[in-house]
Curated annotation (Swiss-Prot):
<dbReference type="InterPro" id="IPR018181">
    <property type="entry name" value="Heat_shock_70_CS"/>
</dbReference>
<feature type="region of interest" description="Disordered">
    <location>
        <begin position="603"/>
        <end position="646"/>
    </location>
</feature>
<keyword id="KW-0067">ATP-binding</keyword>
<dbReference type="InterPro" id="IPR043129">
    <property type="entry name" value="ATPase_NBD"/>
</dbReference>
<keyword id="KW-0597">Phosphoprotein</keyword>
<dbReference type="InterPro" id="IPR029047">
    <property type="entry name" value="HSP70_peptide-bd_sf"/>
</dbReference>
<comment type="similarity">
    <text>Belongs to the heat shock protein 70 family.</text>
</comment>
<feature type="compositionally biased region" description="Low complexity">
    <location>
        <begin position="618"/>
        <end position="627"/>
    </location>
</feature>
<dbReference type="GO" id="GO:0005524">
    <property type="term" value="F:ATP binding"/>
</dbReference>
<dbReference type="InterPro" id="IPR013126">
    <property type="entry name" value="Hsp_70_fam"/>
</dbReference>
<dbReference type="Pfam" id="PF00012">
    <property type="entry name" value="HSP70"/>
</dbReference>
<dbReference type="InterPro" id="IPR029048">
    <property type="entry name" value="HSP70_C_sf"/>
</dbReference>
<dbReference type="InterPro" id="IPR012725">
    <property type="entry name" value="Chaperone_DnaK"/>
</dbReference>
<protein>
    <recommendedName>
        <fullName>Chaperone protein DnaK</fullName>
    </recommendedName>
</protein>
<keyword id="KW-0346">Stress response</keyword>
<keyword id="KW-0143">Chaperone</keyword>
<keyword id="KW-0547">Nucleotide-binding</keyword>
């Protein structure tokens, strides 16, 4: 059976893993890294993903997209989206359906479409490692993602050519990874997941049942717009204000300056986790009538901690609620597991330790644990692993609007999923012919203060006094946390139902169009790679041909030199065009001219008493003399790593 891979689709970085035997393998990407920046760039008709996109961000700020996960499944008018608009160099726009989309090169793109590019990169990374096509995946989402955000994530997978077998909550995935690696008996753990864009906390019970492990989520809470990006933004805001005081220039109006600030803030934040101060030095950050301006600001760890103290404090309240919902106190928690890159910040670790009264565990990789857990769940679904039972919960209450605009819960938050629950309602007026069912998700008592997931109508209700008709409303939530709602008139048996597709989101037609667009891009990418390979082979052959003629000297006749030079010129001209077949034909023509010359020279050298290492195959072009792609050699960036262990 084909492997089901596990993908952590992160705000800042993404990661892919797969179970091999009884071990999970975190798969390195083409650059040799175990995580891939969740950054996509559109440049010269090409789509760049990951490190290549990150490298060119400063010179292409308006077309380089990051932290797109913060927009997925969200409305443009959301307060959190509006806050981000002024802090990112790219353009966030309002789609026709009211969702938050982005605009690149005058083209409107849905967050699902952009996220699909990251998922395609993860898919390709897994395929290159496994040597087989991958079509199925388990993808992680923040535990506090609502129905619209979960559906949007599934849509992104579909656009990327993946059958998403399960959507799994990130803290739950981390607990799966922890449970597999640390078999320490029954215990209750808190997973504190502070990632690039979202925060979750889950209280999870790990139990050993006759050799099998049961991972049961007792409660979950969080904030889907709180993460490392907000920590970066707090520092960016400070730098912008300081520069404004000094130079009277607002850098927020300059996309290029904003992108440079973004990179510098992220770098400084990371440095301040291991040092007490750092200098942010950005020469020529902008210019005005008086000339170029340089930004040089020293930032201490204490200053950064002051800027983000309220953000760290915001993570503690969900921890209190999660414990209360689970009916536990901090003394009941055996282990605290930190997940997400932002959890490396010393202030975060200090506050978590103060709240839970114990030091968080440092033996779980915060960048990889979620992908590892997703891979374990993938193996469970494929039948490769059968000693784990996962019981997850729905993070938010699901209900309908009833008289007076009240939210009447049908499925309470922290209910184990999958789940199905029903409740009987009636009409509010005499002879009412139809009822409108409006489905909401959230914890507010007033229905309209929650997230509207969808609505539908049950009609043809027979005339009757108010309160007499019996309307049974059923909620059915699957293991992905995605909801189906039905309403049935018990007297007539008439039923109406909907698979909740939020009043926003992508239509099936839009998803299909995006899949076709992705497939078209894949074909373009294939053609581009084929053209690049043909050009590389041609260049290698041209170089070796010129070297051969020079090295062989008078062993080559004038006619042969002329023939080689002519063929070289024709091949050089062909490489400047975009016709792969012409390049291949001219390459073969040059090989056919060169081969007899080098073969003859080789034989003459042999007869003369040794070829001195001369090999005619070295001049065949193509891959000859080149490092094979499967030799495992990659281009890499080198960074000096200073050893802090004294």
């Amino acid at each position: 059976m084909a492997k089901i891979i596990g993908i952590d689709l992160g705000t800042t970085n993404s990661c892919v893993a797969v179970l091999e035997g009884d071990k999970v393998k975190v798969i390195e990407n083409a650059e040799g890294a175990r995580t891939t920046p969740s950054i996509i760039a559109y440049k010269d008709g090409e789509i760049l993903v990951g490190q290549s996109a990150k490298r060119q961000a400063v010179t292409n700020p308006k077309n380089t997209l990051f932290a797109i996960k913060r927009l997925i499944g969200r409305r443009y008018e959301d307060q959190a989206v509006q806050k981000d608009i002024g802090l990112v160099p790219y353009k966030i726009i309002k789609a026709d359906n009211g969702d938050a989309w982005v605009e690149v090169n005058d083209k409107k793109l849905a967050p699902q479409q952009i996220s699909a590019e990251i998922l395609k990169k993860m898919k390709k990374t897994a395929e290159d490692y496994l040597g087989e096509t991958v079509t199925e995946a388990v993808i992680t989402v923040p535990a506090y993602f609502n129905d619209a955000q979960r559906q949007a994530t599934k849509d992104a997978g579909k656009i990327a050519g993946l059958d998403v077998k399960r959507i799994i909550n990130e803290p739950t995935a981390a607990a799966l990874a922890f449970g597999m690696d640390k078999k320490e008996g029954d215990r209750k753990v808190a997973v504190y997941d502070l990632g690039g864009g979202t925060f979750d906390v889950s209280i999870i019970e790990i139990a050993d049942l006759d050799g099998d492990q049961q991972i049961e989520v007792l409660s979950t809470n969080g904030d889907t717009f709180l993460g490392g990006e907000d920590f970066d933004n707090a520092l960016i805001e400070y730098l912008v204000e300081e520069f404004k005081k000094e130079q009277n220039v607002n850098l927020k109006n300059d996309p290029l300056a904003l992108q440079r600030l973004k990179e510098a803030a992220e770098k400084a934040k990371i440095e301040l986790s291991s040092s007490n101060a750092t200098e942010i030095n950005l020469p020529y950050i902008t210019a005005d009538a008086t000339g170029p301006k340089h930004l040089v600001i020293n930032v201490t760890r204490a200053k950064l901690e002051g800027l983000v103290a309220d953000l760290v404090a915001r993570t503690i309240e969900p921890c209190k609620i999660a414990l209360k919902d689970a009916g536990l106190s901090t003394s009941d928690i055996s282990d605290v597991i930190l997940v997400g890159g932002q959890s490396r910040m010393p202030l975060v670790q200090q506050k978590v330790q103060e709240f839970f009264g114990r030091e968080p565990r440092k033996d779980v990789n915060p960048d990889e644990a979620v992908a590892i857990g997703a891979a374990i769940q993938g193996a469970v679904l494929s039948g490769d692993k059968n000693d784990v039972l996962l019981l997850d919960v729905t993070p938010l209450t699901l209900g309908i609007e009833t008289m007076g605009g009240v939210l009447t819960p049908i499925i309470e938050k922290n209910t184990t999923i999958p789940a199905k629950k029903s409740q009987v309602f009636s009409t509010a007026a005499d002879n009412q012919p139809a009822v409108d069912i409006s489905v909401y998700q959230g914890e507010r008592k007033m229905a309209q203060q929650n997230k509207l997931l969808g609505n539908f109508q049950l009609g043809d209700i027979p005339p009757a006094p108010r309160g007499v008709p019996q309307i049974e409303v059923s909620f059915d939530i699957n293991a992905d946390g995605i909801l189906k709602v039905s309403a049935k008139d018990k007297s007539t048996g008439k039923e109406q139902s909907i698979q909740i597709k939020a009043n926003s989101g992508l239509s099936d037609a839009e998803i299909e169009a995006m899949i076709k667009d992705a497939e078209a891009n894949a074909e373009e990418d294939r053609k581009f790679e084929e053209l690049a390979k043909a050009r590389n082979e041609a260049d290698a052959l041209i170089s070796s041909s010129n070297k051969a003629v020079k090295d062989l000297g008078d062993k080559v006749t004038e006619d042969e030199k002329t023939a080689v030079n002519t063929a070289v010129s024709e091949l050089e001209a062909a490489t400047k065009e975009n016709d792969v077949e012409v390049i291949k034909a001219k390459t073969e023509a040059l090989q056919n001219i060169l081969m007899p010359i080098t073969q003859r020279a080789y034989e003459q050298a042999q007869q003369a008493g040794g070829a001195e290492g001369f090999d005619p195959n070295a001049f065949q072009g193509g891959d000859a003399g080149q490092q094979k792609a499967d030799d495992g050699v990659v281009d890499a960036e080198f960074t000096e790593v200073k050893d802090d262990k004294k």
